[in-house]
Structures are given as C-alpha cells and as structure tokens.
Amino acid sequence: MLIRRRALWLTIPILIIMTSHKIMCAFDLSHVHSESCLKIQDISSDTINFTPNLVMFRFFSNETHSDVFHLPKCIFDSKLTSYLFDHLNIYEDVSVYKNNFEKYYMGSVEGTYRTIIIKGEDTTPYLDKTTAPTVEITEKDLIITYQGIRYMNPFPVLSLIDDESCEVFDDINELILPYFGKCRKFYLNFGSVTLFGHITSNFVTIKYTAQNGTDPYTIRLFFGNSAEIVHTLPFEAQDLALRMMMYDDFEIIGEVGPVKEMLKSFKLSLLDSLLEQNHEDVMNDFRHVFEAFYNHIKKIRDGSIDIKSLHIEQLLDSLLAYSIGYYIQYRYPPYTGKWRGIEHFIETETYIHMVPELFDLFAHNMTVKTPTRPNAIKFINILIRLYSYTDYTKLDHRGLSLYFLKYIYQGNVTDDIATYAHRYMTNLYTKYTYPKTQEGEHLYKSYNDSLDTFILNTIGLKSKNKTLLHHILLLQTGMCNIQNMIGHFHSLQNNDPKFGALLSPCYRSLRYDLTAKKIGQLITKESLEPYGRLVNMVRFMTKNSSMLNVLKCELPEDDGLLAIATVDNKTYIISSRPIAVGVVYKATYTAINLFLYVTRIQNNTCIHIDKVYRDGDVKAVYTFSLDTAKDCGDMCPSVLVEYQTNTGFIGIHVINSIADIQYISENRKLFPESSHYLWLLKNDTVLELEGTNFFLFSSKSPGAIVLYIIIISLIVWTLYEIIKLFCYKRQWQYQKL
C-alpha cells in the first residue's frame, strides 16, 4: 500500500528560496537576501517588543482551544511574497474552489487513477564503491576498472551543474507554485503548436497549448517527485495524479474535456507498461521511445495517420518516455555510492542527444538547450584516449558516439571531430555501395550503421566546416538508393523497434524526388506503397531539409527538383527541367516528355528561372582509359548520375578513389545495362558515359608490365598455333586432293 501524508487544508505554504545563481524567470530574485527582514536594532534591543511588526493568526480547534501563529509583517511586504500570493489565489471563495474541482481533470474522479508497483529490475550496470575490494584506478575520482569492465563516477557528468537556474510554473494560472532551480529546457514545434519542457533534478514537466476547433486549451504533464513542489489551493498531488509510485508520480493538469480528448491518443496502458517494467532503467525508457515511434510509423504506413489528421498528442507517448529517461539520467541525488558502467553511459547519453533529431523527422523542430559542459568535455577526451580513438584509424560505433558527445558538450564541431566523421562517412559509404561481397548490400544489416549514418548527418548539419558538410550530404544522398529503401521497408516489417530500424539516409539527404509514385517506378518487384506514405510524411515535416545548408536560397521541391550534388566546391542541381541560373547540361537518352537536366550553379547562389538558360557542352564517352598507378586527379571526388530512358533519375554514385572506379569496372552486374550515366567531375566537366564497359584500366607498374608481357606472349603463341593448325589443315586437304 502506498501511504502519503496529506497536509491540512488550511495550511498556507510559505516558500523561501535562497540562491546565489542568476535565475531567468518572470520574477527578479536579485532582491532576495538571507538576512532577517526585521531590523537588527530591534532584535538586539533590551526591551524587545515585536508586536507592531507581527501579524497574528489564530486557529480554533474548538471553543476552548486555539493555536496562535505570529509572522513578521515584513514578509508580506516582500516582492517575492507578493509574487507567490498572486499565484495562490487566496482571495477566491469556496464556490471558485468548487468550480475548479469540477473544471480540472482528476484521475480519482474519472476512474483513471492507479497505483503502480514496479515489477522489473533496473539492469543498469552499477558497482558499489564499498563492495569492490580490488579495483584499478584508471583516472582518479573519475574512472575505475573492475574485472575488465570500466566504470565511471556519475557526478559531475550526469548532473545539471552546468545548466542555468530557471523558473518553472511561472504562469499566473498554474496549479503548481513557481519552482526555482537548475533546469534544462527543451522545445518542440508541431504545426502551430509549441511544446515547452523543463528537466530538473527532481522532475520533468511538459506544457503545450493547442486548439480544439476555435477554443485554445492548455495541458501540462508532470513526472517526478511531487514532494518537491507545492500545488495551489484547493489541489494536492493526490488530486491531479493519474499514476503514483513510491518515489515518482505522473500528473496531467488540464480541463476535463481536452484531457479526455488527449487520452484517446495518449495511451495510459503504454505508460503503465513502462513504469511496471521499471522506468528507473534508462535503457528501458528508450526501448519504449523506439517502440512508440515504431507504432507511430506503422500507423503512417497503413494510412491511419496522414498529413490531414496529424496532431501533437500522437507523439506524446514517445515524448513522455524520452523525458522520463532524460530525467532519470540526470536526477538528484546521483548514485554517489555507486560507479556506473561506461559502455552503458555512452549508449544512453548518445540516445538522449540523438532522439531530438528523431523527433525532428516527425515534428517540425525539436531543440534541447544543452549548455557547455567543461567537466563532461574533459571526461570524453579521457575516454577517447583510453579507447584509442585519437589517431582516427579505429572507426566504429563507440568511437563515433564519443566524438558526437564531445560535439554536444562543447557545442561546436572541432577539427578532430570533423576528421573522424569524414573518414567514418567514407568508410560507411564504401562498405554498402562498393561491398566486398560483390552483391547488392543494404544498410539495415547493422542497425548501428544506420544509426551512425544519422549521427553523421547531425554532425554535418551542425558543423561550420563546409567540406565536411558537403561530403556527408553527398554520400548520404548517394546512399538514398533502391537497395537501402527496400532494406528499410523490410526492417520496418520485422517488428524489431530498434533506433537504427526507424531511420533512413533518405530522410535528410539532398534527394527530393521520392514521391509514392516515383518509389513505385524505381521498385517494381514488390509494392512499397506503405513506405511511400512514410517518406511523404517525413518529406512534409522536414520540407527543404538540408537544402539551406548548401544553398543560399530555397528551391521549390515540387517544381522539378530531383536532387542536389555537392562535388568538391561545385554545386549541381539535378532536375526534370531547368530551375536555376547556371550552366545547364541535358541528358541525351530519355523518353519523349521525360527530361533530365544537371545545372552547375556559382557560389551556391541559386536564382530561380523558367525558360531561358545557358546550354553546357556534354561530351559523349564510350570508353575511358585510366591508369591505376596514378592519382585520382579530377575524378575524385566525382559523381555518376544514373538515369534510365523511361524512368528518369535513378540515383547517384559517388567516386572517392581510383579503387571505386575499378570496383565499378569489375562489377558491372551491380550497374544495370539499361542505365545511362552523366559523370560530374570537379573540374567543371560533364561527360555522358555510353555502353556497359566504359572504364578501361592501364598501368605502368612493373608487375603490370610483366603481366602484360605474359598475356601478350600467350596471345601471340595462341595466334601462332591457330595459324599453324590452319596451314596444316590446308596442306592436308591439298595432299588429299
């Protein structure tokens, strides 16, 4: 049984806040001091008479007994007191209290209240400092190694020590008194609705205002330790709570009608599942985040949710689970008596800072105000050194996660992060575009690789390093291909809601032609109509995504734009008609009424055009002889634009090295004979490659010369034998005659 002490109804809460930090809030706390508001000379006087400076409160428990309370008058002259009293509504009469009870949603009245008993275990790898007899101190007060596993001190990395102080519940009509303390703010934009959130060391809260027809309504969600907040009269935590546990409560604060409507989309059964399985396990919280997103995507795919039926409540399941995980990761008090597994920290902390990017795909924008974290930066640098990622040769998921967290904590992409990200992106692209198996590969054979592609996209978009940005976006546009679309479609059917399974390199690439119709044209072996609905939804929510990162203007996606390719410092617009000022190259082998144009623009500045444009000279090439002993030169990086006569634009292939060209030459079965290619070189040359064996290789290396001599000798010897045989046969026929 869960037992809570209920305060007396007539108790007046007096909240005194002492702080040395600057607090950003509606009330200016600079006037709050720790000394008494009574004059010092009055207190030190021999004959103290406090009566003129006191206010007396007398409460009768019966006719003969009463309790008397004296409070200094100066308390009521305080600006802070006036501010708090404005939120208390103490002058309202009983009828107003009654109306509020009927107006606001209460779980106990509506029959939705439940007490939750946690059944699952917290599987977070902790190590008790007092029970570990022999540990290796890797870094004093920060890292230890026990039985081959590294552990960390959660403090100060997993704390809000670097965050600004702020005020929560500052609106005059809130049912909770203002709370002052350290907090991390986040925002989510969904159409015309802006959702505000605060993560503190004691709770997390979310508030948004939306429209029900023409009437606006406000709803606040609260999860955490309700003992750390004070509700306004006549409410207490028990009145507003829908779920209560030993340490944390879940409250919904809103009027009856809007909350009932919200609960049609926001399923309390999913929250119950999370809480019963143990929400104190952060990894468990994120499993529920991904499962909620998986269910949301499933509804988009089957048509239950479309663009016209979108509303904020459809994302509240995943948003609340994410907020709970964030709060648990940073809550107070930290596990000061326990060390925490570093591998677990890296994974959960990466999820915490990457999930907002996932929300960006299905809402219009999500922002978390993360401060600069000096202690955390120092800690991550230690881990990068300990795990041997400083020389950029060890490219794996953990290394990328560490460099990503370094970017998050310091707020900018430094050269070391850019170098690691650049190499990692090249490695991923080569792995799946030019695979060693010599078979068509897709990204979803490893969900970590899919997640890493999304992490790299985030680093690139947030970087001021244009070389890195162009490199990542170009390669991810290339990875938005038929194999990866089919792989993603199947991964969403496997009922395996992992983070990587939810993502596609198409989501924030520079490819804009993937309508449901185009996907049907590209993939004819099976119907991907449900996948087309998903791509259309993300395209709608992330309109012109990544475009303004490479262009100084915005091109309309529905006006013939197919893709954008950034080759070295050149930008090419691939479209079904000329749409920007520049040098325009037209593909040759397209059907009637089907066109493909490539426009090279200057200085990333695009000016929209309608009809008049400058033709570029496209050189037709049947074979292209390359020397493997030489550098790539103007051919690296370069882009092959693939298209077909009846389908039009298929995709792009990025060439980063001479090995990529050699791979294409040796694995022509991976490149359909029905396709044609425009080759965009970085020296402003555009070639049209014709035929199926357009790359021929030569070499001047000694080994190759010896090999060629042997081959030529064999050819000469074979010809000699054929001629000899022919001559012998003719001679025999002559003799017979």
From Swiss-Prot:
Belongs to the herpesviridae glycoprotein H family. The lineage of its organism: Viruses, Duplodnaviria, Heunggongvirae, Peploviricota, Herviviricetes. It is found in: Virion membrane; Host cell membrane; Host endosome membrane. It is a single-pass type I membrane protein. Residues 724-737 are intravirion. This is Envelope glycoprotein H. The gene is gH. Residues 1-25 form the signal peptide. The heterodimer glycoprotein H-glycoprotein L is required for the fusion of viral and plasma membranes leading to virus entry into the host cell. Following initial binding to host receptor, membrane fusion is mediated by the fusion machinery composed of gB and the heterodimer gH/gL. May also be involved in the fusion between the virion envelope and the outer nuclear membrane during virion morphogenesis. Keywords: Fusion of virus membrane with host cell membrane, Fusion of virus membrane with host membrane, Glycoprotein, Host cell membrane, Host endosome, Host membrane, Membrane, Sialic acid, Signal, Transmembrane, Transmembrane helix, Viral envelope protein, Viral penetration into host cytoplasm, Virion, Virus entry into host cell. N-glycosylated, O-glycosylated, and sialylated. The keyword Signal applies. One of its GO terms (biological process) is symbiont entry into host cell. Interacts with glycoprotein L (gL); this interaction is necessary for the correct processing and cell surface expression of gH. The heterodimer gH/gL seems to interact with gB trimers during fusion. One of its GO terms (cellular component) is host cell plasma membrane. Residues 191-253 are annotated as: Interaction with gL.
